[in-house]
Protein backbone atom coordinates (compact mmCIF):
# COMPACT_ATOMS: atom_id res chain seq x y z
CA UNK A 1 0.00 0.00 0.00
CA UNK A 2 1.31 3.40 -0.99
CA UNK A 3 1.68 5.94 1.83
CA UNK A 4 0.67 9.06 -0.12
CA UNK A 5 -2.75 8.48 -1.72
CA UNK A 6 -3.31 10.31 -4.97
CA UNK A 7 0.34 10.13 -6.01
CA UNK A 8 0.11 6.71 -7.64
CA UNK A 9 0.08 8.19 -11.14
CA UNK A 10 3.08 10.37 -10.31
CA UNK A 11 5.00 7.39 -8.94
CA UNK A 12 4.14 5.40 -12.06
CA UNK A 13 5.34 8.27 -14.24
CA UNK A 14 8.64 8.44 -12.33
CA UNK A 15 9.17 4.70 -12.68
CA UNK A 16 8.50 4.80 -16.41
CA UNK A 17 10.69 7.89 -16.84
CA UNK A 18 13.54 6.10 -15.08
CA UNK A 19 13.02 2.81 -16.92
CA UNK A 20 12.88 4.12 -20.50
CA UNK A 21 16.46 5.49 -20.67
CA UNK A 22 17.84 2.41 -18.90
CA UNK A 23 16.02 0.12 -21.34
CA UNK A 24 17.26 2.19 -24.28
CA UNK A 25 20.87 1.86 -23.12
CA UNK A 26 20.52 -1.87 -22.50
CA UNK A 27 18.87 -2.39 -25.90
CA UNK A 28 21.68 -0.47 -27.58
CA UNK A 29 24.35 -2.50 -25.78
CA UNK A 30 22.69 -5.79 -26.75
CA UNK A 31 21.64 -5.06 -30.34
CA UNK A 32 24.35 -2.69 -31.59
CA UNK A 33 26.85 -4.24 -33.97
CA UNK A 34 30.39 -4.59 -32.71
CA UNK A 35 32.84 -2.68 -34.86
CA UNK A 36 36.54 -3.11 -35.22
CA UNK A 37 38.65 -0.58 -33.36
CA UNK A 38 39.98 1.15 -36.49
CA UNK A 39 36.57 1.81 -38.00
CA UNK A 40 35.02 2.96 -34.78
CA UNK A 41 36.54 6.44 -34.85
CA UNK A 42 35.87 7.11 -38.55
CA UNK A 43 33.38 9.78 -39.52
CA UNK A 44 30.11 8.53 -41.02
CA UNK A 45 29.44 10.24 -44.35
CA UNK A 46 26.17 8.67 -45.58
CA UNK A 47 27.76 5.39 -46.58
CA UNK A 48 30.55 7.00 -48.60
CA UNK A 49 34.23 6.68 -47.85
CA UNK A 50 35.31 9.47 -45.46
CA UNK A 51 37.27 12.29 -47.07
CA UNK A 52 39.69 14.10 -44.77
CA UNK A 53 39.54 14.36 -41.02
CA UNK A 54 36.55 15.44 -39.00
CA UNK A 55 38.44 16.55 -35.92
CA UNK A 56 38.66 20.32 -36.37
CA UNK A 57 38.59 23.18 -33.91
CA UNK A 58 35.68 25.59 -33.98
CA UNK A 59 36.00 29.26 -33.29
CA UNK A 60 34.71 30.40 -29.88
CA UNK A 61 32.39 32.86 -31.67
CA UNK A 62 30.08 30.01 -32.63
CA UNK A 63 29.83 29.00 -28.99
CA UNK A 64 28.93 32.53 -27.88
CA UNK A 65 26.23 32.90 -30.54
CA UNK A 66 24.80 29.51 -29.60
CA UNK A 67 24.79 30.42 -25.92
CA UNK A 68 22.99 33.72 -26.52
CA UNK A 69 20.51 31.95 -28.81
CA UNK A 70 19.73 29.31 -26.17
CA UNK A 71 19.19 31.98 -23.51
CA UNK A 72 16.67 33.88 -25.61
CA UNK A 73 15.07 30.71 -26.92
CA UNK A 74 14.37 29.67 -23.33
CA UNK A 75 12.97 33.16 -22.73
CA UNK A 76 10.47 32.58 -25.51
CA UNK A 77 9.46 29.23 -24.04
CA UNK A 78 8.80 30.89 -20.67
CA UNK A 79 6.96 33.91 -22.06
CA UNK A 80 4.60 32.05 -24.40
CA UNK A 81 2.43 30.44 -21.68
CA UNK A 82 2.35 33.77 -19.87
CA UNK A 83 1.13 35.53 -23.01
CA UNK A 84 -1.57 32.91 -23.59
CA UNK A 85 -2.93 33.24 -20.03
CA UNK A 86 -2.31 36.98 -19.70
CA UNK A 87 -5.96 37.98 -19.14
CA UNK A 88 -6.47 35.52 -16.27
CA UNK A 89 -3.23 36.14 -14.39
CA UNK A 90 -3.64 39.69 -13.18
CA UNK A 91 -1.27 42.50 -12.25
CA UNK A 92 1.20 40.46 -10.16
CA UNK A 93 1.96 38.12 -13.06
CA UNK A 94 2.42 41.14 -15.34
CA UNK A 95 4.95 42.65 -12.92
CA UNK A 96 6.76 39.31 -12.62
CA UNK A 97 6.99 39.08 -16.42
CA UNK A 98 8.35 42.62 -16.57
CA UNK A 99 11.03 41.74 -14.01
CA UNK A 100 11.92 38.62 -16.03
CA UNK A 101 12.18 40.64 -19.24
CA UNK A 102 14.24 43.32 -17.47
CA UNK A 103 16.73 40.70 -16.28
CA UNK A 104 17.04 39.41 -19.84
CA UNK A 105 17.51 42.93 -21.20
CA UNK A 106 20.34 43.44 -18.70
CA UNK A 107 21.86 40.12 -19.84
CA UNK A 108 21.57 41.20 -23.47
CA UNK A 109 23.21 44.56 -22.70
CA UNK A 110 26.03 42.75 -20.88
CA UNK A 111 26.59 40.36 -23.80
CA UNK A 112 26.54 43.27 -26.22
CA UNK A 113 29.01 45.28 -24.14
CA UNK A 114 31.38 42.30 -23.82
CA UNK A 115 31.33 41.85 -27.61
CA UNK A 116 29.57 38.50 -27.65
CA UNK A 117 27.31 39.67 -30.48
CA UNK A 118 30.10 40.98 -32.73
CA UNK A 119 31.36 38.78 -35.52
CA UNK A 120 34.62 40.56 -36.42
From Swiss-Prot:
The chain crosses the membrane at residues 10-30, 64-84, 89-109. Its main location: membrane. It is an enzyme of class 7 (translocase). It is found in: Cellular thylakoid membrane. It comes from Synechococcus sp. (strain RCC307). Its EC number is 7.1.1.-. NDH-1 can be composed of about 15 different subunits; different subcomplexes with different compositions have been identified which probably have different functions. This is NAD(P)H-quinone oxidoreductase subunit 3. The gene is ndhC. GO terms for biological process: photosynthesis, light reaction.
Amino acid sequence: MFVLPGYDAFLGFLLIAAAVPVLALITNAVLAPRSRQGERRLTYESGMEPVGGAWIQFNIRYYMFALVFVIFDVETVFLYPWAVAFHRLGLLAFIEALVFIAILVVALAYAWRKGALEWS
